[in-house]
């Protein structure tokens, strides 16, 4: 009823073409057919994904243009909700209850600004960002309207980031923050500029400041966790994610936390987290289906780590979850996604004939519009089925997509999955084994410094291989090194203590840990285990 009333009011304001949608699926279907000039989006969409999730999806799919104005409407004043809305850069935010006059003012203002900036926005839509910047600078010289100038400066920083001119973007954000250090979008822009420019320490310092306020804590912790993952510091990443209450974890944040658990061989905790999240979203079918597939991946991963005669229970649960996802939805992409997971399950069951039958189904080669997790499933399936050429072909497409993806939880998760595929089919493993072999030879000769160097190179190529990690820690301890390159000894020990190890590896880690404790004069200065830089 609220949508119909709003539509009627817009028609009364002389808007001729006004279309209503009840959920994101309806909007996506419409956007595939025609463009929209202005989108008024409510945050709460009933038993469907919320407005922010919908906007993120259509932006990622390229269904919404830079020239489309977005106005968010919500009755929710919670910092967590407002923060999520601000993150998608709407042109305006209207808090309910609203008046028709306030709607009219906001819509008119957004469309006026859109018309003013259209020459720039059209060039951005055509991916002509260099030309868009030239046009923007010309308009900035001519404009005398402070409000429009402010929007132009904000857009200029975004274009500079798109062009990889991070230092120039940083200067803009710093100038804005000098005027007021409470402009949140400028803080996020500065953090992004620093991060993309490789200034990790600067971005981390700003992010730590952002954890002090409720409005920005969750996003800052997620970002800090991603930075930690980039440095293979999964224990540290987990600590940041623990600062977000489970009930306030977004869908992508829950996925990120689950993959952090899996990276530490703690699959049971990943399953427990995703099961809770899935159950709490039972009433929101789209999220429920996605979480069912995420959970199925966890069970497939757990089954892969077991002996072939111990996989049945995990595989049965995985297949049930795959089948339950989108049961009533006719979506070709979802069908392909599920079929690749079914193929993996068949391969883990040892039924290669069934797997090949699934892989031969129509549409299984059509991965252009597939998401990265589906593509990594496809790589694993083709590789395990014996078609390494096909697996490498998809891996290359995957790497290109990953390079072009925006920095986000999803990109970090996908990078972890792609890295796993690279380890399986790439050239890294033989090289890592060669470094490890040389390291062992030097270690036997008590050349601990050079042994540590070799173990470190093997670790960089295969950071999740526990043998390489233990060898590196052993080398550092015997070389009496507090820190080697990016690895801090005590922080690294803490990381390894979080992982689920075999009895043999656990015994070895205990011996190394005892040796560190016996050498307090060397390692005692860093009892707080500061993070690697």
Cite the ranges covered by each PLM segment.
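Two-component/phosphorelay signaling modules centered on CheY-like receiver
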Residues: 1-20, 25
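Alpha4 helix (beta4-alpha4-beta5 surface) of REC/receiver domains from two-component response regulators
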Residues: 52-53, 66, 76-92, 105
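CheY-like receiver
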Residues: 111-165
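Conserved phosphotransfer microenvironments
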Residues: 42-59, 66, 478, 482-485
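Flexible loop/N-cap segments at domain edges
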Residues: 167-389, 393, 398, 411-413, ...
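C-terminal output helix
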Residues: 5, 80, 98-107
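Acidic, metal-coordinating helix/loop segments flanking the phosphotransfer/catalytic sites
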Residues: 20-38, 46, 167
